[in-house]
Every structure is written in C-alpha cells, then in structure tokens.
Amino acid sequence: MRIDIDTCEEILITITRNKTRSLLTAFGVFWGIFMLVALIGGGQGMQNAMQVQFEGFATNSGFAWPQKTGEAYKGFRKGRWWSLNIDDIERIRKNVDGIELITPSIARWGSKSVYEDKKFDCIVKGLHPEYENIEAQDISLGRFINDVDIREARKVCVIGKRVYESLFTPGTDPLGKYIRVDGIYYRVIGLSVAEGNISIQGQSSESVILPFTTMQRAYNLGRNIELACFTVKPGLKVTDIQPEVERIIKEAHFISPDDKQAIMVLNTEAMFSMMDNLFTGIRILIWMVGLGTLLAGAIGVSNIMMVTAVSYTHLRAHETRGNL
C-alpha cells in the first residue's frame, strides 16, 4: 500500500491545530472499545456465575410438594394441611406417560452430626439412588446410595463437603468412619463435593444423605414424604405433564380440581429458560451500548477528516489565487 506523505502531514497538522477535538475523539474511540470489551466480559462473567449456581441440576426436572388447601372440597375445610406419600409416587409413575423417572425425598433440618470431639449442624436427607440423575452429587470419594442400601435400610451415609471439613482433619479419608447423627451411628460410604448454592432442601455441602428407607425408620416418618422429584422424557416439557401430575394427586387427597394453591411445583426447566432469555436480552443491550459508543467515536473521527478536507480545500484555494 502506497503511503501519501503529504496527506499524512496534512492530517498531522490538522490534529495538532485541533488538539482538544482530537483528544476527545481519541478518548471516545478508546472508551467505546473499552466499554464494549468490559460489558461483554462482565455479561459473560455474570452468566457463568449464574450457571454455577444451577450446576448439576437436570434441566427437565420438576419438584412437587404440598401446601394448605385453598378451597373447601367434599366435606374438607379450606386451609387443610395434607401430605404426599409413597403411594403418590407409584400413582404418578404408572399413570403419567411423560415421566422419565420419579423419586421421593425427605429431609430434616437442624440435626447434629458428631465425629469424635467435633460437631456440625447439618441437614439430613433421605434419598433414593435415582435422585442423582436429578441433582448431581459429584462424588469424589466412595459411592452414592445404591439399591441394596435401600432394600436393607443400611445405616450408611454420604456426607457433604462442609460436613467433611467440619468433622475431619484435612487429608483424612472419611470412608468407613462412623459419624453420629441425632444419636444414631452411620458409616460414611461417600463424599459429595457438589458446590451449587441453589439446592433442593438445603445445600448439598451441608447435608448428610441417608438411604430413604433408613431415614424413614430412624425418624419414624411412616409413608409420608416431603417432595416428589421427577424428570420428563426427551422432547417433553415439565409444563406438558404438570396438569396430569396435579390431577392425580388432587384426586387421591380429596383436593378440589380448581384449587391453585394446594400443590406447589418448582419447574427448573422454566427457570433455565427464563435465565437464558434474560442473558440473551443482556447480550443484545451490551452490543447496542458498545456499538453506540464506538459509533460516537467514529463520528468524531469523521469530523476530524472533514476538518482536514475543508482546511485542505481552503489552502489550495489560497494558493491558486496567489498564483493568479
């Protein structure tokens, strides 16, 4: 590419004659690039941080739990408390075709876990092996609950990261050790290092997970459960099967079909979709602001070029008159 020295000299002279305008234009271009890069980086960082919070959750999962009834129905008063039970799990599994898997969950807050002279306030959860397909447990040592643990109601447990750090010295292998939870001893069979801050029934890092049947017996919970946790088959959405799930539960517990508050359903699929839409909007806004700032800088550059062209025209005109 051929460089026109005269043109470069004229541009340099014009820039030095209009120092303030030149500096402001240069700053505008710099600021536009900086804002675009900073906004893109900040938006991506925010998105990554939010994704970490939901890390490990199945995107096609749902969670149902009971609330007070909102309407009187078949002799039962409004405001009645009721409970889900194991039979509800079987009803839904057999009668809702779109269900991929469904499993019950129970939990107890404020429990005391003890190992030797160390103590930690933890959350005790009773789960089935299938639950790991809904919320990944990220087992770093040992294993998760299995079918034999459920069938034999074994006194074994999987502990969370904070439970381990509070009860054991760093580097200690917890597998095979016995911890006492609410007065009952359990053998540690696994260590979960799941880090997500958003978790069902409390954070995994602060949990002691027992086989579902073991917790039923230890706390005399009978057949009642707290959550029905499920995923839907590929190609379906939670909203596709949610009405049928609610209908089956309402029929079994004498709840009005029109009662909107008796059953709460957390739709993680809708949450993920909402988050994706939010960050799509943020990305569009970022590009609009960044490109707008760059455009302002480009207009400033074009102004300098225009000033250069005008100055050059006047200069040539004066030279022409002088020659005449």
PLM features: what roles do these ranges have?
Residues 71-82, 114-119, 191-196, 221, ...:
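Structural beta->alpha junctions
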Residues 20-48:
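Short, strongly hydrophobic transmembrane alpha-helices
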